[in-house]
């Protein structure tokens, strides 16, 4: 009953008239925006890079096909491509508590180190490159279509005209000014989308 209720299924979009009457959302007129947990952020990158194969519904899950997901890394102690340190660094940076002590609510602090992580750490760079390779492997797409696919895959929505224009400007900068190849240019763009609030927050 709860998950099918109108309250639970609300959008997090801001309505000025309602916000003026209930700025703190005490009456739940919109869905409260919340940041994804550390494990969900990591698994999202993993899935976008094509590292979590789809499995048929109606059958027991084969966990061996999802062994690189965060929950299995944390319980088994193994990690893909020898990046265990970077994965644990990410999980701790975004609020995962390795102590195992139960808490009623995780720390959802926002800090500069998190922003720097998306741009400088080799873990998101690796998965951004894998996603760039997936995008470039899709046949018969022009740049505008490829940008739209990228945004839909990563944040679940198409870019508006101004954002599309800014994206083309950035891609041209990567290609011409920085003299990067196609895969590297698209990987840089994907890193920028990874670092956006639209990727980290559930609306």
Question: What are the functions of these language-model segments?
Answer:
Residues 1, 7-158, 188, 193-203:
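An acidic, gly/pro-interrupted, aromatic-rich
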Residues 141-143, 176-185:
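Short, charged, surface-exposed loops that flank catalytic or proteolytic processing sites
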Residues 148, 160-168:
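Short, well-structured alpha-helical segments
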Residues 154, 165-176:
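Amphipathic alpha-helical segments that form the core helices of the histone-fold
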């Amino acid at each position: 009953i709860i998950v099918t209720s109108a309250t639970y299924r609300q959008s997090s979009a801001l309505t000025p008239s309602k916000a003026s009457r209930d700025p703190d959302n005490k009456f739940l007129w919109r869905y409260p925006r919340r940041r994804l947990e550390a494990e969900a952020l990591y698994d999202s990158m993993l899935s976008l890079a094509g590292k979590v194969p789809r499995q048929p519904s109606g059958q027991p899950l084969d966990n061996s096909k999802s062994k690189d997901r965060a929950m299995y890394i944390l319980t088994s102690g193994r990690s893909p491509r020898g990046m265990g340190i970077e994965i644990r660094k990410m999980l701790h940076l975004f609020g995962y508590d390795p102590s195992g002590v139960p808490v009623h609510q995780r720390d959802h602090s926002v800090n500069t180190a998190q922003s720097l992580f998306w741009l400088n750490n080799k873990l998101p760079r690796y998965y951004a490159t894998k996603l760039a390779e997936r995008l470039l492997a899709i046949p018969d797409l022009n740049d505008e279509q490829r940008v739209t696919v990228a945004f839909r895959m990563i944040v679940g929505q198409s870019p508006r005209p101004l954002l599309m224009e800014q994206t083309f400007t950035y891609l041209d900068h990567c290609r011409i000014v920085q003299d990067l190849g196609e895969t590297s240019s698209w990987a840089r763009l994907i890193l920028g989308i990874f670092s956006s609030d639209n990727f980290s927050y559930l609306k």
